[in-house]
Amino acid sequence: FVAASNEIVLVTTPEPTSITDSYSLLKALYKRPDFDPSKVCIRVISNRAASKEDGSIVFNKINSVVMQFLNGSLEYLGYVPSDAMVEKAVRQQKILSIYDPTSKAARSFEEIAKRLLDNESAALDEKRTISHVFSNFFNRKQ
């Protein structure tokens, strides 16, 4: 489904292996003959970042490598800080935004969701619908 999408949200963490895996995924995507980077918006979320700056550093590392070696660019969607409340909510099998809506991670999720919705509203057209994604997916299989 990634290759059939017009919008991709890539979630990575500050760990070197996560950054490497993210780049490897993007490299494989860019090498696909049916991939047209001019028609795809790839956004990045830095997960479990120590700070806002740490999240930006993670994004800048991936984006600079993509620009240099794949001749592409990414958009930064935001970061989710490391937050003990995430683990506590998981252990309680609760949704974080219900378990502790004031936690740092819950507030970051809300900010990211607002950005996604703002982008969706600004770009609401046929190319963004799920039917278009499925149409692209099945047309590429032929």
What function would you assign to each model-found segment?
Residues 68-95, 109:
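Beta-strand-loop-alpha "switch" segments that mediate conformational coupling across diverse proteins
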Residues 65, 69, 83, 115, ...:
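Phosphate/oxyanion-binding loops and surfaces in catalytic or ligand/nucleic-acid-binding neighborhoods
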Residues 24, 85, 104:
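Residue-level recognition of oxygen-bearing side chains
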Residues 57, 61, 81, 104-107, ...:
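Short amphipathic alpha-helical segments
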Residues 28-39, 63, 85-96, 120-134:
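Short secondary-structure transition/capping segments
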Residues 95-142:
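NTP-binding/hydrolysis catalytic cores, primarily Walker-type P-loop NTPases
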Residues 1-78:
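Conserved catalytic-core segment of NTP-binding enzymes
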